[in-house]
């Protein structure tokens, strides 16, 4: 199949590249960390023995105690660590050293010794196949999504399991982008576009929708300002920073737990999975 015969994949690529181009146009290269995710990494680390995570409980239904799991883009081990407690072995592939530092620390604290971490992108990673390949909230920013998915398939002996939001996870920050940078944010593709790509590839997955998840808030104005500066590529003390601080006052509301974005709707996500055998 030629590129011209893949309109869904072409649309996906255009959206991702346009989003990245828009981001690069406002970035101050001198202010960027080589590891974008390092400042956020600790927020993605959770107790691997937690029992109050309905998403985790749904995911582990796809994994047996004697199976091996490959977690692609698994970050700080949010799912890799608890899954490792319930299966034979987990391999975690992740390009962010900041995220992997958190995963290693979490594994050490929990006494998990059946986790292998591989530093690098999925495109460049060389790993052995596993029974189940998990890919949680990774595909949004992948321009060449078809070969990425084909590689997931090639490494899954039994099943591919993808976790995806209906809307891109950062879409709730779009009003701040417009207030700061003066233009509408180009959104990355999400679950609807993924399904179109999969169907175009001849993959017809099962889709299981999960319960809505409450929108993430911030414990304080300082935390909100720090995280939004990083997410929106805003340098402190610039005119854009002034616009951001004004927009926080206008677009957020105080709650007993801190700050929340006005009108932010609960996130809807689903498990997209298919057999490969």
Where is each model-derived feature located?
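A short glycine-rich, Lys/Arg-flanked "PGG" loop and its adjoining helix->strand segment in the class I
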Residues: 146-161
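Short alpha-helix
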Residues: 187-202
């Amino acid at each position: 199949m030629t590129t011209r015969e893949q309109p869904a994949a072409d649309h996906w690529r255009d959206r991702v590249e346009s989003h990245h181009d828009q981001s690069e146009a406002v970035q101050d290269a001198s202010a960027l960390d080589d590891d974008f995710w390092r400042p956020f990494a600790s927020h993605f680390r959770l107790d691997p023995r937690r029992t109050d995570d309905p998403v985790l409980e749904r995911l582990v239904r796809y994994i047996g105690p004697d199976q091996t799991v490959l977690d692609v883009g698994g970050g700080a081990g949010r799912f890799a660590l608890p899954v490792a407690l319930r299966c034979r072995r987990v391999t975690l592939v992740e390009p962010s050293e900041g995220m992997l530092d958190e995963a290693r620390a979490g594994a050490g604290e929990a006494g998990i010794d059946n986790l292998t971490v591989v530093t690098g992108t999925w495109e460049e990673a060389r790993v052995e196949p596993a029974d189940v390949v998990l890919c949680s909230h990774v595909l949004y920013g992948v321009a060449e999504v078809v070969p990425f998915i084909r590689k997931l398939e090639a490494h899954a002996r039994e099943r591919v399991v993808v976790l995806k939001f209906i809307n891109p996870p950062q879409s709730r920050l779009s009003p701040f982008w417009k207030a700061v940078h003066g233009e509408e944010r180009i959104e990355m593709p999400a679950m609807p576009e993924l399904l179109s790509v999969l169907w175009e590839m001849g993959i017809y997955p099962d889709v299981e929708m999960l319960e809505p998840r409450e929108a993430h808030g911030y414990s304080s104005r300082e935390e909100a300002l720090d995280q939004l500066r990083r997410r929106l590529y805003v340098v402190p003390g610039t005119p854009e920073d002034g616009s951001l601080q004004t927009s926080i006052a206008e677009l957020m509301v105080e709650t007993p737990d801190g700050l929340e974005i006005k009108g932010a709707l609960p996130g809807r996500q689903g498990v997209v999975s298919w057999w490969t055998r």
